């Protein structure tokens, strides 16, 4: 299961700045997921191949009443649901009473905690950190989050070793061996399909059903299963946890993951329900294909788009399900379709199904799109095929000039699966404009007939073998150089 990292501390110690660096966003609000309390934001971070969910909390104001009574509720919950805590302090301001109170609370929870001293740029670090040793939280990691200084050391020395410990590579997925064989494909003949003893079709498809509360996720699960396996009640929040249910359909095995709804922020009052939001995100990370359920009567909300953003960032295959389609007039249906085209036009690769989970209409067609998305995400493509498609794309639309030179695309190969990753090697490819990168992505998608899954393009440039090297002069060149030096000295 993907680990959860919480950032806690007093106001204005730099939590959001570090959050933005870890999640690679410019504004913490971009990753503001509904279903959490007002000042709590979270996003997906990936560092050197390790993935984790990062939570940014509102500042904790420890006063004379004590941190237990004055600590913001969302920050307390972030500590509870996190696997590890990054406790941030302000090195410029020094040790404050609130820092002491927060440290006391963290020690009582016995959570793995790393003490991070921020704003260390331009000051004597050793002197600034001296007082913080009294907090009794072990080593102190000095950083300057606004400039990125020390963040790499924090990751390499503290966070990444911990992620490896709680989420070892061999436990990531049962099909890791299969994908490892895919990675080794490039060493063989380009067109030859290696003989594999293992096939992705032998694995059950993990199918997560996500959406806002009361959009009909559990009703859809029960309709698919043909039994009342999940509690259903016409009231938001009746599903408290992610439920894993194995099933078989059309001689294919599946694991259905019914999740709790992601609710509008500020409207969650039950502690148990707040915990379920993290489990929803973890279910998305664990799934192969995600069914995003939208209520046709309520339309697309910001919560739907936020959840959609997390699904896309995770690289999961996607099928959009518009539920409660029955009973709507033709005029309303046309309006809903226009809204979908307008707000979801950027994900034209995903199939959209209009269904009624309650009555079962349209549900049977979902699995055709699920299988199509899974097959697209796990399909194996040879280096020769990808290179041929790349060359056709370059012939149809030449790469632009960069600093007076034409960008050269050399070859392409598969860099990963689920989602499909195409790695393109060439000269100056990292300088390609975003418009041409999108063109290549769409060209590969159309040529490979990829449907239901995002496709990613990565660019790599070969190292210059003559970089940082000086030419060795021949004996004649050395003699000529000496004569020139003597001539210059005489002329002076």
Swiss-Prot record:
PROSITE patterns: G_ENGA (PS51712). One of its GO terms (molecular function) is GTP binding. Residues 3-166, 205-378 form the EngA-type G domain. One of its GO terms (biological process) is ribosome biogenesis. SUPFAM superfamilies: P-loop containing nucleoside triphosphate hydrolases. Residues 379-463 form the KH-like domain. Keywords: GTP-binding, Nucleotide-binding, Repeat, Ribosome biogenesis. GTP 1 binds at residues 9-16, 56-60, 118-121. InterPro entries: G_ENGA (IPR031166), GTP-bd (IPR006073), GTPase_Der (IPR016484), KH_dom-like (IPR032859), KH_dom-like_a/b (IPR015946), P-loop_NTPase (IPR027417), Small_GTP-bd (IPR005225). GTP 2 binds at residues 211-218, 258-262, 323-326. It holds the Pfam family MMR_HSR1. HAMAP family: GTPase_Der. PANTHER family: GTPASE DER (PTHR43834:SF6). Belongs to the TRAFAC class TrmE-Era-EngA-EngB-Septin-like GTPase superfamily. EngA (Der) GTPase family. NCBIfam families: GTPase_EngA (TIGR03594), small_GTP (TIGR00231). GTPase that plays an essential role in the late steps of ribosome biogenesis. Associates with the 50S ribosomal subunit. This is GTPase Der. It comes from Klebsiella pneumoniae subsp. pneumoniae (strain ATCC 700721 / MGH 78578). The gene is der.
């Amino acid at each position: 299961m993907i680990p959860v990292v919480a950032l806690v501390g007093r106001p204005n110690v730099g939590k959001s700045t570090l959050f933005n660096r870890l999640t690679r966003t410019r504004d913490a609000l971009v990753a503001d997921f509904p279903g959490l309390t007002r000042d709590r934001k979270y996003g997906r971070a990936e560092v050197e191949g390790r993935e984790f969910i990062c939570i940014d909390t509102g500042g904790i104001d420890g006063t004379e009443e004590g941190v237990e009574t004055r600590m913001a509720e969302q920050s307390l919950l972030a500590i509870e649901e996190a696997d590890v805590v990054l406790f941030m302090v302000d090195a410029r301001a020094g040790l404050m009473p609130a820092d002491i109170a927060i440290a006391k609370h963290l020690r009582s929870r016995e959570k793995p905690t790393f003490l991070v001293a921020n704003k260390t740029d331009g000051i004597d670090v050793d002197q600034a950190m001296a007082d913080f040793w009294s907090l009794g939280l072990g080593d102190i990691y000095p950083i300057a989050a606004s400039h990125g200084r020390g963040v790499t050391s924090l990751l390499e020395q503290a966070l990444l070793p911990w992620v490896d410990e709680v989420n070892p590579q061999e436990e990531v997925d049962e099909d890791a061996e299969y994908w490892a064989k895919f990675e080794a494909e490039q060493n063989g003949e380009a067109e030859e399909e290696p003989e594999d003893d293992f096939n992705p079709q032998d694995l059950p498809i993990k199918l997560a059903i996500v959406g806002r509360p009361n959009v009909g996720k559990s009703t859809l699960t029960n309709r698919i299963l043909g039994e009342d396996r999940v509690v259903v009640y016409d009231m938001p929040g009746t599903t408290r946890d992610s439920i894993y249910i194995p099933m078989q359909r059309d001689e294919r095995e599946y694991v259905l993951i019914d999740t709790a709804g992601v609710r509008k922020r500020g409207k969650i009052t039950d502690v148990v329900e707040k915990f379920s939001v993290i489990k929803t995100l973890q279910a998305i990370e664990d799934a192969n294909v995600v069914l995003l359920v939208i209520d046709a009567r309520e339309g697309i909300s910001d919560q739907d788009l936020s959840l959609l953003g997390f699904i896309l960032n995770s690289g999961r295959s996607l099928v959009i399900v518009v539920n409660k389609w029955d009973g709507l007039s033709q005029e309303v249906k046309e309006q809903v379709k226009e809204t979908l085209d307008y707000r979801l036009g950027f994900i034209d690769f995903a199939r959209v199904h209009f269904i009624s989970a309650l009555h079962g209409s349209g549900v049977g067609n979902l699995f055709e799109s699920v299988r199509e998305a899974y097959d697209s995400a796990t399909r194996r493509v040879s280096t020769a095929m990808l290179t041929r498609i790349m060359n056709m794309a370059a012939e149809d639309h030449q790469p632009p000039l960069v600093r007076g030179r034409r960008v050269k695309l050399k070859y392409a190969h598969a860099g990963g699966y689920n989602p499909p990753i195409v790695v393109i090697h060439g000269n100056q490819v990292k300088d390609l404009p975003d418009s041409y990168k999108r063109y290549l992505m769409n060209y590969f998608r159309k040529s490979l007939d990829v449907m239901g899954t995002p496709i990613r393009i990565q660019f790599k440039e070969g190292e210059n073998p003559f970089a940082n090297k000086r030419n060795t002069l021949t004996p004649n060149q050395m003699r000529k150089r000496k004569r020139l030096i003597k001539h210059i000295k005489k002329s002076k």
